[in-house]
Swiss-Prot record:
The lineage of its organism: Eukaryota, Metazoa, Spiralia, Lophotrochozoa, Mollusca. Belongs to the teretoxin C (TC) superfamily. Expressed by the venom duct. Contains 4 disulfide bonds. Keywords: Cleavage on pair of basic residues, Disulfide bond, Secreted, Signal, Toxin. Residues 1-22 form the signal peptide. Coiled coil: none annotated. It is found in: Secreted. This is Teretoxin Tan22.12. It comes from Terebra anilis. Its main location: secreted. It comes from the Eukaryota. The cysteine framework is XXII (C-C-C-C-C-C-C-C). One of its GO terms (cellular component) is extracellular region.
């Protein structure tokens, strides 16, 4: 019985951890979008006027088309997005 309880707690902890990470990704992308002042660079690309935000901004823009997928409960997609988020940092 103790083993089952321990396994259940591990599963709950992992699920909560994934949800928190998704919330972090969502918050970072939303904050970036709101605080970024977009400008068009000489080469025609759109960049963020705030240098610290530029890397995250690029990440968020690349995620924009599938951000809703990142919020779904498909652990493969979540894991992929979380890894991309950590690499973009």
């Amino acid at each position: 019985m103790k083993v089952l309880f321990t396994l259940a707690m591990i599963v709950v902890t992992l699920c909560l951890g994934q949800r928190m990470r998704r919330d972090i990704i969502d918050d970072v992308c939303n904050t970036c979008e709101m605080s970024c002042q977009w400008v068009i660079a000489n080469n025609g690309t759109t960049v963020c006027r705030i240098p610290e935000c530029d890397t995250i901004a690029a990440f968020c823009k690349s995620l924009k088309f599938n951000m809703s997928e990142c919020m779904e409960d498909d652990s493969f997609i979540q894991d992929h997005c979380i890894r991309a988020f950590l690499l973009a940092d």
